[in-house]
């Protein structure tokens, strides 16, 4: 529902999920994807990867914010909650937090659910979001912003600010609607 890269998801810190003011002073829950000097294992693919991704309502309905609040309430020895990742149990290996998740997804999850094909892997979820938005007529520059794709315009990528979260939410995120897009009845077989 976000179109984020697997490593972007796996390397999220608790404080990367936050409310950000939109156009009308309303706050919107977002993933703040950024490279942070004090977190050297957190790397972005390119300059366009640095972005704010509004959180889809389905993820909110599934209790993501309650999960964040729970993580914030836990006492961590010698560390504040801000220094913890959302998925702290994922080890860093081969330059990524996503390596083991990718292996598990491709070698265990997909075969167990009879979804294994040569063309399906975790990255297929990004392609699904991209294609879904394209088929809904969303302009490519909005899709690129949501997905963190480079546009080829280095000036915009390096010096330009990203769209306001409300714009990306309205142009993209709220248009990500699958037939069973609800917190209790998601059918992943079509992915």
PLM regions and their residue ranges:
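Short, basic (Lys/Arg/His-rich) helix/loop patches that form interaction surfaces
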Residues: 2, 76, 93-145, 149-152
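Alpha-helix N-cap/helix-start motif at helix boundaries, enriched for small hydrophobics
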Residues: 7-12, 143
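Active-site/catalytic core of tyrosine-dependent DNA strand-transfer enzymes
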Residues: 37, 49, 54-117
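Active/binding-pocket-proximal capping segment
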Residues: 15-19, 24-32, 72-73, 103-107, ...
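Tryptophan-centric aromatic hotspots in well-structured domains and transmembrane helices
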Residues: 1, 26-31, 64-65, 122-125
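Catalytic-site neighborhood detector that most strongly recognizes the C-terminal catalytic loop/helix
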Residues: 147-186, 191
